[in-house]
């Protein structure tokens, strides 16, 4: 198989970024007749797609680092989830052309420290900028969707040119729009206008609040089995609320209510969410503050989904139950089944017993991870729908413990296929 690709680049920097003519190099090499020929070529059939792409496309030193630490993981997850091979290559080609330049300089241990580069990523405790995940549905097998979140950065991040690291994410969104004519920018542009800050104001706020290290924006992708790539804009509320002198909760309400075309249609669900928030009992830590929003980057309409993320103060099962039921407002059969599943999860994974529902989980590792919820809002819905997240490693003594407990959980709920393959998949992804 002969690939027609550009010359390799220099040792440093993202030279593809400077030349827009090269931005679709992978999608040209791995689509149409070229991809059909590749799939028929026995000489590459035994090699994983990430290895094939790595061997034939140009990679500078920075590209190589990020491909090996992010692209390879994405590829391994697609292999484990059984994505069709053609879709696997098309997804990696999109990742190479559109996403790979968004990671910026190779991280250094001195990032964010005196004398080092000013920006250190915040998405994970160790400074990682990439959070991949599998969305397991129904049986944990063929419905699995590959997803990931990214905290973009570049040489401007944290400097006077971009104090709050807003520009690298914007560049990524523009590449997404250039790559896909159906990538609708209406909600992104609205979010940018409502929550992002100009350079002068960003510098002023950074000086006024030097101890605040909140991010401004993440971006996320769902790579669906249909071939659709769903982008998600994740703006944070901290800096804009400081600028306006209002609470993050009030800011979230304003932004959602003002969404083009459908903002007023979230009125009932926002009222129910507010009732849930203000009713948070003291023994659960009281009312938490929203952290961020999440917009699906789609044309605003009746199916437009918006999420508000909150982090409760407590990690006990009863705290989780309170959030999951919106303080008792959600009491239908599906919610009851979800509560039972959460109870099983806490029992199997965290070993809580009868009478320990108010006990806080034991923390084995420091860091800001913990329990997180989002409330998903849809137009005309009476109530938002909560989703539960937990940083399991924080509450487990070792990786082996995580593997054993989650395997037991999959087996308990009848996901035998996931239980049988989980330990192997974990090791293969490392």
Residues of each region from the PLM?
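Fungal eukaryote-biased detector of long internal structured cores
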Residues: 108-304, 312
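Intrinsically disordered, low-structural-confidence terminal and linker regions
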Residues: 1-71
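Short Lys/Arg-enriched alpha/beta "domain-start" segment
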Residues: 61-107
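Compact beta-rich and alpha/beta scaffold cores in large eukaryotic transport/transcription complexes
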Residues: 243-430
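Intrinsically disordered, low-complexity regions enriched in Ser/Pro/Gly/Gln/His and often acidic
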Residues: 59-60, 96, 112, 266, ...
